[in-house]
Each structure stands twice: as C-alpha cells, then as structure tokens.
UniProtKB/Swiss-Prot annotation:
InterPro entries: Cupin_2 (IPR013096), Homeodomain-like_sf (IPR009057), HTH_AraC (IPR018060), HTH_AraC-typ_CS (IPR018062), RmlC-like_jellyroll (IPR014710), RmlC_Cupin_sf (IPR011051), Tscrpt_reg_AraC-type_HTH (IPR020449). Coiled coil: none annotated. This is HTH-type transcriptional regulator ChbR. The lineage of its organism: Bacteria, Pseudomonadati, Pseudomonadota, Gammaproteobacteria, Enterobacterales. It comes from Escherichia coli (strain K12). Residues 168-274 form the HTH araC/xylS-type domain. Homodimer.
C-alpha cells in the first residue's frame, strides 16, 4: 500500500528584483525584537552582523547564537529565520546582488563552508563599522564603497576561517558563567563577585580561564556586557546618561563615560546624537 506523500511547507523566497532597485546592495540597520519574515531563502547573497544585543538564527535547520561582533553569511540555496529571545537587537543586514557578488567576490569564497557557521569580527574592525555607520550619510555615494569593503572583510573571514588554529573548546562551566552574567542582576552590582560565585572557582582560576578561552579578563567581559546594555538603553530609551550609568552597574557617570568611549570611540551623549541623526 502506498504511503501518502507529506509535502514540506513551502519556504518563502525574498527576491532581488523586489528589493534592490537595480543596485548592487540592499542595506538596512534594524532594531529588532521579532522576526517579520519568518523562514525564508533568497535569490541573492546576504550577511548579518550584530552591532548590539544577541539573538538566535536558525540556518538550514541548525540554531546558532549570535552576539555583538558576530556575523553569518547566507549563500544561495540556504534558508534561515531569526528568533529574538533576549530583547532588542541591532543588526547590520547586507544583501548582495547575485551578479555583483559572482563577478567580484565568488572567486574568493571557500570551495566548501557551512552556512550555519558563526564568525567573529575583531574589535578594531567592529569599532570602525560602528564609527562609519554613526557618521556616514547613507544617502551619499560613500555607502557603496563602505559596504563593498565590509563585504570583502566578511568573505576574507570565511576564506581564512579554516586556516585558523583550532583552540580548545570553552568549558561548559565557563560558557554557563558568561551566559548568566548577561542577566542585569548579575552585572549591575558586585559584578566581579557575582561572576566568581557563578563559576564556583577562585578568582585567580576564573581569570586564567577567561584569558585562555576569551583573551579577556573577567572585568573586560563584564564591561563589554555593561556597555552593550548601555548602548541598548541609549538606542531604545530617553533615560539620562547618569541613570543609564547606574543601571549598568557603574559607581559614577565619569567612569561609565570613560569606559563607554574606550569600547566604542564615542561618548554616550555623542553616540545617542549620531543615532538620532542617522534615523532622521
């Protein structure tokens, strides 16, 4: 007896012809709390880079976590959808026309790579991207040059990823500790003591572990989490810089401003002003 054929749900296709208006790139910066597009695929190439926050993408059936500085590259033939379970996330989304990509970038693409692989930008490049986004008038010709360069960086990271030295897997206890430190009650007050307690290790052991696996001290990790939180507050609320400083766990606004500028190259006030100008 023949078994009934069960058809898989059809996957929607986002089409270059509907989005690009004849241009080489389709560029958006999103502040997202939920996915509108759902499960979909494209007839063009795409990458997404996380500027602020964290979220999940499910790519070809595999769910991966993306945090600030992470990106994924979605080639033709892959399908994906996003899940925003950690609140608002700010994303640079770049679509590249099939013709332009295959003319300029395809020869650089690795012969074989996994679409669900998460890649990390280095801090200097991420700071550069944020600086340009905050200062560039995206209606002028500088946009295309900037996006071409960022796309080259993305493809270059894919090209060299397999050549990188394989580092030890991060221990589960350390992953769990860093994950829990994203909770506001953990990073806002007595953050270092909280991190040590969550790890169930001595501070010295924890420091050696974070430096080995993340290349950072516990306080550097804490400050990145705090500043990421503060950026979301500056983007999404009208709270004063002083209020945000205390909410993020800093004992004084001046220390907050100094740390914010060190990690982003902007003061909190100028960061908010640039965002306002960009969104107008």
């Amino acid at each position: 007896m023949m078994q009934p054929v069960i058809n898989a749900p059809e996957i929607a296709t986002a089409r270059e012809q509907q989005l690009f208006n004849g241009k080489n790139f389709h560029v958006f910066i999103y502040n997202k709390t939920e996915s509108i597009s759902g499960l979909h695929q494209h007839d063009y190439y795409e990458f997404t880079l996380v500027l602020t926050g964290r979220y999940f993408q499910e790519i070809n059936g595999k769910r991966v976590l993306l945090e600030r500085g992470d990106f994924v590259f979605i080639p033709l033939g892959s399908h994906h959808q996003s899940f925003y379970e950690f609140g608002a996330t700010r994303i640079l989304n770049v679509g590249i026309s099939k013709r332009f990509f295959e003319q300029h970038y395809l020869p650089l693409l690795p012969y074989c790579f996994v679409a669900s692989q998460v890649y990390r930008t280095n801090n200097a490049f991420l700071t550069y991207v944020e600086t340009v986004i905050s200062s560039l008038n995206f209606r002028e010709t500088g946009l295309e040059e900037f996006v071409e360069m960022v796309t080259f960086y993305v493809i270059n990271r894919l090209r060299h990823y397999r050549e990188e030295q394989v580092i030890d897997d991060v221990p589960q206890w350390l992953k769990s500790t860093v994950e829990k430190m994203h909770d506001k009650e953990q990073f806002s007050e007595s953050a270092l003591e909280n991190m040590v307690a969550l790890s169930a290790k001595s501070q010295e052991y924890l420091t050696r572990a974070t430096q080995r696996y993340y290349g950072k001290t516990p306080m550097q990790i804490i400050n990145e989490i705090r500043i990421n939180f503060a950026k979301k507050q500056l983007e999404m609320t009208n709270y004063s810089v002083t209020d945000i400083a205390f909410e993020a766990g800093y004992s004084s606004p001046s220390l907050f401003i100094k740390t914010f500028k060190k990690l982003t190259s902007f003061t909190p006030k100028s960061y908010r002003k640039k965002l306002t100008e960009f969104n107008q």
